[in-house]
């Protein structure tokens, strides 16, 4: 049975609002609006470089910023900003109905909160397995440890990290442009294909031998 590995944030759900809201809380009174913030982030600029390049009134050291970020980014208050992309539920439902096994792999910290969010979205029965690195290991190491599912036709994600993971494991890598990296940034990691949104996965070469209709 063919299977697909999906990333979560930026791939199946819109989580940009959550990240920008937390950034604005921790680094107040900057010249950055959401568009400018994501322009920098999608170009691959990390928080340390970004914070050092702008005016703000935060007294946090970068190490303190990182600690607070990890403490709050998956709090219920901020997770409530997340919403599924309008096309994600129908895609997952259709793939499942075609006997394609769906796996979710995310670098989040708390498996129980991932499970709760999937239940909120009505997605808890779509995935054969949900894997959470808990920030304790890389996605690559997690997949090696548990074993890559049989007949994986693609791994889809919104970051260079996802593409690199797929490439190193010999999985067909698909980058998606709804998330945290721009097309120019994703191309640096040599994806097999780049798509505008996750529902376009059915039009990739990964599906050329799959009877999807």
Set out the residue ranges of the language-model regions.
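Asp-based, Mg2+/Mn2+-dependent phosphohydrolase catalytic module
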Residues: 1-2, 112-213
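N-terminal helical cap/lid subdomain that shapes the substrate entry/recognition surface
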Residues: 2-86, 90
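Short, contiguous strand/loop micro-motifs
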Residues: 10, 37-38, 77-79, 101-104, ...
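Substrate-recognition element of Asp-dependent hydrolases with the DxDx(T/V) motif
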Residues: 23, 88-118, 133
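Short, flexible active-site-adjacent loop segments at beta-strand->alpha-helix junctions, enriched
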Residues: 69, 108, 159
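Well-ordered alpha-helical segments embedded in enzymatic catalytic cores
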Residues: 87-91, 142-145
């Amino acid at each position: 049975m063919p299977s697909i590995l999906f990333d979560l944030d930026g791939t199946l759900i819109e989580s940009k609002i959550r990240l920008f809201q937390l950034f604005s809380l921790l680094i107040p009174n900057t010249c950055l609006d959401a568009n400018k913030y994501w322009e920098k982030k999608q170009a691959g600029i990390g928080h340390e470089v970004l914070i050092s390049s702008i005016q703000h009134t935060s007294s946090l050291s970068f190490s303190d910023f990182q600690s607070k970020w990890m403490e709050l980014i998956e709090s219920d208050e901020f997770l409530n900003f997340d919403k599924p992309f309008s096309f994600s539920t129908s895609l997952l439902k259709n793939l499942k109905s075609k006997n394609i096994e769906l796996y979710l792999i995310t670098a989040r910290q708390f498996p129980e909160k991932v499970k709760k969010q999937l239940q909120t979205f009505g997605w808890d029965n779509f995935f054969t397995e949900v894997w959470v690195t808990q920030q304790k290991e890389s996605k690559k190491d997690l997949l090696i440890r548990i074993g890559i599912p049989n007949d994986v036709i693609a791994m889809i994600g919104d970051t260079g990290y996802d593409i690199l993971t797929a490439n190193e494991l010999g999985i067909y890598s698909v980058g998606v442009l709804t998330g945290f990296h721009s097309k120019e940034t994703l191309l640096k990691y040599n994806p097999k294909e780049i798509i505008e949104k996750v529902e376009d996965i059915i039009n990739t070469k990964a599906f050329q031998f799959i009877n999807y209709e």
